[in-house]
């Protein structure tokens, strides 16, 4: 319900950012966002695909549910050729953006679990949604797993023995000046990592009436 209603996404993002100490300029920028031209209305699907082999086709094709970059993301494995069509899940040069869908929805956990799932598939080549073919699929997946581990470790180190609002952590993690779009992406990506680390029991989210903040969990 409302999956492709971008106004709902923007409203949730603004509410969340305000509680994380985002400045008025950032909140005002969210109000100015227009629905992307590529985000047309989604028609009701004729067929709902389930994870597993596609039936009634003359080829061994398998649907792999790979949420993370998007909550409905799928990859498609052509078993005869062992080519994985990864969409935006695995890209050759960059790591896909992990969105802040909902404070209760751990999108980074979903993404890293999806990487683990795909790593265990028999594959010779990855055909991504953007960029060149990935000829060393397992190496690329390992690189992406390491990227998120390093970022998580860096956030833990940045917090140290202090406590910071989500917005302060964004500025620590991304110190150089970003344009409006990349600042929104950086905010959501940072929040996705914070939620992930909280669910791992490594940090905690302290909720205040004014601005929420994050701190490390004291190990006994």
Region locations from a protein language model:
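C-terminal regulatory/interaction regions
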Residues: 154-220
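Residue-level detector of conserved, well-ordered beta-strand and adjacent loop positions
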Residues: 50, 67, 215-217
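Short, well-ordered beta-strand micro-motif
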Residues: 56, 75-77, 215
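A general structural signal for well-ordered alpha-helical segments in protein cores
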Residues: 9-10, 141, 152, 166
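Active-site HxH/HxHxD metal-binding segment of metal-dependent hydrolases
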Residues: 1-54
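Metallo-beta-lactamase
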Residues: 29-47, 60-152
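Generic structural signal for secondary-structure transition and capping sites
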Residues: 54, 123-124, 164
